[in-house]
């Protein structure tokens, strides 16, 4: 997974500096070059990158995705699909890239209103629809997990026509929750 990371938080900018001479496209190009001149990556190795379905200017993100493919990436892992706009941008990506790229849509269950608000406000690249955040109000842990499963299954179903598969992100080490999600997705 060739990624360059998130922007440095404002509070840490005096101590930590951004590195601009390298980006994920150059990293992918370098990784592919390790196979040797004119050779493909040995199977089963492949280079993937990130695709932010929630980018403010998605046309720029889509152009970068095309550049990533030109520099040796085979596909993308998306940010979690938690909004109708993310699904629309996933569709737009599939239409633009066709079968040239594998796309694995991210599925991450939201488990509480606090979790949803944190993801929306503090995690770069994730957008949780306000309607989803509101639905978690007043729910206990069990109810929150059940709603999280429902939202995740609906997100996966909406993303399925445009994705080659999914990758799952486990919230708060809740393995049993993920087992239930996998069972529902089968």
Could you tell me what each predicted segment is?
Residues 5-7, 18-40, 50-55, 97-155, ...:
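Active-site pocket-lining/capping segments in soluble small-molecule metabolic enzymes
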Residues 168-186:
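C-terminal/domain-terminus segments
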Residues 68, 72, 105, 166:
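Conserved, mostly hydrophobic/aromatic
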Residues 57-68, 148-158:
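Short, acidic/polar
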Residues 1-2, 74-84, 146, 167-170:
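Catalytic beta/alpha-barrel core
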Residues 11-22, 74-79:
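Flexible, glycine/proline-enriched loop segments at strand-loop-helix junctions
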């Amino acid at each position: 997974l060739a990624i360059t990371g998130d922007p440095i938080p404002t509070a840490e900018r005096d101590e930590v500096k951004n590195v601009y001479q390298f980006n994920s496209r150059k990293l992918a190009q370098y990784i592919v070059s390790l196979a040797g001149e004119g050779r493909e990556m040995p199977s089963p190795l492949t280079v993937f990158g990130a695709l932010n379905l929630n980018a403010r200017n998605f046309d720029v993100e889509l152009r970068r995705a095309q550049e990533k493919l030109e520099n040796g990436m085979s596909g993308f892992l998306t940010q979690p699909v938690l909004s109708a706009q993310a699904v629309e941008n996933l569709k737009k990506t599939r239409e633009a890239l066709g079968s040239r790229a594998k796309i694995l849509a991210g599925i991450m269950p939201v488990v509480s209103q606090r979790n949803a608000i944190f993801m929306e406000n503090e995690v770069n690249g994730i957008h949780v629809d306000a309607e989803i955040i509101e639905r978690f109000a007043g729910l206990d842990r069990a109810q929150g997990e059940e709603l999280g499963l429902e939202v995740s299954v609906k997100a996966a179903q909406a993303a399925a026509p445009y994705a080659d598969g999914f990758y799952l992100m486990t919230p708060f080490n809740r393995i049993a929750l993920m087992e239930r999600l996998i069972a529902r997705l089968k």
